[in-house]
Amino acid sequence: MALLELERISAQYPGAETPVLADINLSLGPRQLLVALGPSGSGKTSLLNLIAGFVAPSGGRITLDGVPVQGPGAERGVVFQDDALLPWQNVLGNVAFGLELAGVPRAEREAKAREMLALVDLDGFGERRIWQLSGGQKQRVGLARALAADPRVLLMDEPFGALDAFTREQMQELLLQVWQRTAKPVFLITHDIEEAVFLASELVLLAPNPGRVVERLQLDFGQRYAAGESARAIKSDPAFIETREHVLARVFSQRQSLQERA
């Protein structure tokens, strides 16, 4: 049964000649890691913003647990590419910030924040200042903060896009570990093909102008990692390589088609 449903979603910005998104139908179910991948102009970030409730769709309906999404809410935790942390707060204060706004007592919110920091392998980092953290550590704090409110679904907007290649791989593996431990449904957008293939239980390919779904792939590489298989073994598997090359060819063909129309 789907927790999150998008039915015939379209989006068009004021003054734009063409829609950003057209006729998008998606569902996110329990324990699913849904990844949206597409070239620039395919509406990935716009799609996430609609689900988060930051903007309203021009047409269609978005529901969470059968209730229409009509604005931001704590039941949808968001992790951004820019860590968006509060520099005047320490790590613990950042993770507990949403709980503080919700009126959770201090002892309870700090205990929850420490639990989430342990989940993302930052046990003992609570008193550190944000400027003392590496890029990967900041993203771990952002993930812990999003999880602290116990959201129904986790939304991730190219969360590893600004990280170096080594740290990016570490964060991909951490996300799969957290996904397995928490059983939280995740909707993630990325422009990185290998990342998308590795993480997704379902991969949705978007084409641009307007953004629309052109292919859906059911994948198990992330589940294999969560079950204990090494990332190196998975990424050298001929099945992984074949899938990656198939997705790469689809994305390149979309870009070429876009250039020919320009």
From Swiss-Prot:
Q: Name one GO cellular component term.
A: plasma membrane
According to its record, how does it sit in the membrane?
Peripheral membrane protein
Q: Name one Pfam family in it.
A: ABC_tran
Binding residues for ATP, per the UniProt record?
A: 38-45
Q: What Gene Ontology molecular function terms does this protein carry?
A: ABC-type taurine transporter transporter activity; ATP binding; ATP hydrolysis activity
Keywords, ordered alphabetically:
ATP-binding, Cell inner membrane, Cell membrane, Membrane, Nucleotide-binding, Translocase, Transport
Q: What is its EC number?
A: 7.6.2.7
Q: Where does this protein reside within or beyond the cell?
A: Cell inner membrane
**PROSITE patterns given in the database record:** ABC_TRANSPORTER_1, ABC_TRANSPORTER_2, TAUB
Its recorded reaction(s) are: taurine(out) + ATP + H2O = taurine(in) + ADP + phosphate + H(+)
Domain ABC transporter intervals: 4-233
> Which InterPro entries has this protein been placed in?
AAA+_ATPase (IPR003593), ABC_transporter-like_ATP-bd (IPR003439), ABC_transporter-like_CS (IPR017871), ABC_transporter_ATP-bind (IPR050166), P-loop_NTPase (IPR027417)
What highest taxon heads this organism's lineage? Bacteria
Predominant cellular place of this UniProt entry's protein = membrane
Known function = Part of the ABC transporter complex TauABC involved in taurine import. Responsible for energy coupling to the transport system.
Family per record? Belongs to the ABC transporter superfamily. Taurine importer (TC 3.A.1.17.1) family.
Question: What assembly does the database describe for this protein?
Answer: The complex is composed of two ATP-binding proteins (TauB), two transmembrane proteins (TauC) and a solute-binding protein (TauA).
Tell me what this protein is called: Taurine import ATP-binding protein TauB
Which gene is the coding source of this polypeptide chain? tauB
